[in-house]
């Protein structure tokens, strides 16, 4: 570039000449009144145990919206701002002391009504936020029992139903929405995909008699650049009443009643430990833990590619401690079952090839920890 170019241009050394004029300043203001109302009641003689508490709460929650990263012209349209998230939450439960104080049981049921639930996706290599409406209902149970002076068990159970309400959204992984009348075309200039009518594209290819038509994908994906010939063929059909034969973003997919991301219907954990005195201020604890998680989806579109299979994990440890000396030694094993299960994943956008980045359970590990306190 010419080093003496106008203000706002770069020279060949990468230095900016003069002042750079950025785009318009984006502003957003969000505010809401929130609150929480509830009660708790110790049942006494009316409860299943002498120490049982019943509680119930109603609350109104709020999380402010924000501003999405700017997008280049000609790419998938993204709203400049995303809306606030609102939640009306209802919860009832009990807390009970069992076995004369040797045990504890907590039970809770809840229902969350979300308006504008904020979800993230990747567009043009940037993380953007969108809003959906959702309903979440669930049940949780916690149980602990010191069965003897040396042995205790604890367990938790979670049951969850987290689904979207009636709505349609654009899936960047399936921009045609499964409609065979539309094709995905990649614009080499922007590396983004767009959607054009199958009939229009086939007519265009037939009109060129198989010869190369330079810049065709870019022209298809940027309808304002279409010349008369291209417009004639691509204009044969429209998507969502858009012209020419183009739905730049794609065909929305019905996600009504789909599961929310990373919301398994069942989770379960079980743990047990045995503690024993060894003499001379030394004690030892042997502990084992097991965790199970049901199937879930990584995206709200609930495709087979979004599914994360159920998985389980087990850990074990053996520790020795001397309280008087402030010394502790622990031997442990993580991922005892040596399971290579995927625990989470996310999908990128078309500019990076729509690849999926996955996160695996860490491989089996053996280790020793030594601690000293003064």
Locate predicted features.
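Transmembrane beta-strands of outer-membrane beta-barrel proteins
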Residues: 1, 35, 52-54, 103-107, ...
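Signature of Gram-negative outer-membrane beta-barrel scaffolds
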Residues: 1-49
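Hydrophobic, lipid-facing positions within transmembrane beta-strands of outer-membrane proteins
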Residues: 33-39, 78, 88-92, 137-141, ...
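Membrane-embedded beta-barrel scaffold of Gram-negative outer-membrane proteins
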Residues: 42, 53-63, 81-168
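Short loop/turn motifs that connect adjacent beta-strands in outer-membrane beta-barrel proteins
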Residues: 44-52, 99-102, 150, 277-284, ...
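Transmembrane beta-strands of outer-membrane beta-barrel pores
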Residues: 58-64, 71, 98, 109-115, ...
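Gram-negative outer-membrane beta-barrel transporters
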Residues: 111-113, 130-300, 371
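C-terminal beta-signal and adjacent terminal beta-strands/loops
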Residues: 162, 289-299, 320-374
